[in-house]
Amino acid sequence: MLLIRSKINITNLSFHRLLKPRALLLLAASSLLLGSFNAAHGTETGSNARSISNTTTTLPEQQATDIKNLPIVWVNVAKGELKVFGTLEDGTRNALFATKVSIGRNGSGKTRSGDQKTPVGIYKTEKFIERKDLPKRYGNGAFTLNYPNQYDKILDRTGDGIWIHGRPSEKEDAPYLDTKGCVDMDDENLNKLREFIQPKGTTVIISEEFEPTSLGPNQTAIIQRIQNWSNAWVSLDHESYMDFYDKSFFNGSRNYSDWDNYKGRINAFKSFINIQLSDFEILNYPEEEDLIWVSFQQSYASSNYNWEGRKITLWKKDNRHRWKIVFEGNE
């Protein structure tokens, strides 16, 4: 599995489109309808966006700078093992911590509520709940995970309450298949785990294979593809921009046709777009063929709206072996 945890800056600033007088009038008249942005979903809805100045700069070459030394958690459900990995200067992963864990009584591959399986996918820690706020069966506390994630929801996977937690002393040597879907370990190792990861925002990979030891061979190809996508976006060439989206695209509310119409409509009223992408995290999605999960920080500004936040895209190879977007949304 490819793993990239790096700070890669892709900056596209002010590709201006000349608008005819009538289009300029439409832009002004439409500002009340198309001038603001719903930051939670990335959709323009109102009239309180801030205007920014029209500046033009050249597009710099993409550069990979400092690799972010942010630990990730990997749960190998086939072996009942959890590891925490750090990153060396050359991008190689090294194990910082390892422990045996128990998973769902019915194994892995959760698809529905109550199936007592542990999900497979890429998740984030949301918070840590202390022992005093939990029943005894959770031991010294629990990290909550964001299952179901965006991809799970697209696949109609149900259920919730998937945690990484401790266990009471009388169950210190619990069997491999023992939980209702959570990942659990003895309290001593849970306390050690807390020393390495953050309560919120730590990446947790749950899979049957994969050990993240290197950046992998696809780094250059996928980063170049992302840069080409951002180039098409800021150019305001709608046809070129949509060519980066697969016909199977779905973001939970819009399919490919809906997205095509939506983006074409809102971008028609823009005179320029500025984009800066940075702090990439790139992973092959567990147990999926040719599906890459890309998370990054996005700073976006246009002639009628500004937004900054973290975004997720899922890229899949089409029948011509080109990486195309099948999902886009906010993290």
PLM-predicted stretches and their roles:
Residues K117, G264-I312:
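Surface-exposed, charged secondary-structure patches
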Residues T55-P71, V101-G114, Y123-F128:
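N-terminal post-signal-peptidase region of extra-cytosolic proteins
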Residues D115-V120, I129-Q227:
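Exported/periplasmic cell-wall-interacting domains
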Residues N218-D237, F244:
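Short, aromatic-enriched amphipathic alpha-helices that serve as compact interaction elements
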Residues M1-L18:
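N-terminal secretory signal peptides that target proteins for export/translocation
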Residues W307-E331:
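Short beta-strand edge/turn micro-motifs at domain boundaries
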Residues A23-G35:
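Bacterial N-terminal signal peptides
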Residues H238, M242-R254:
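Short, solvent-exposed secondary-structure junction/capping segments
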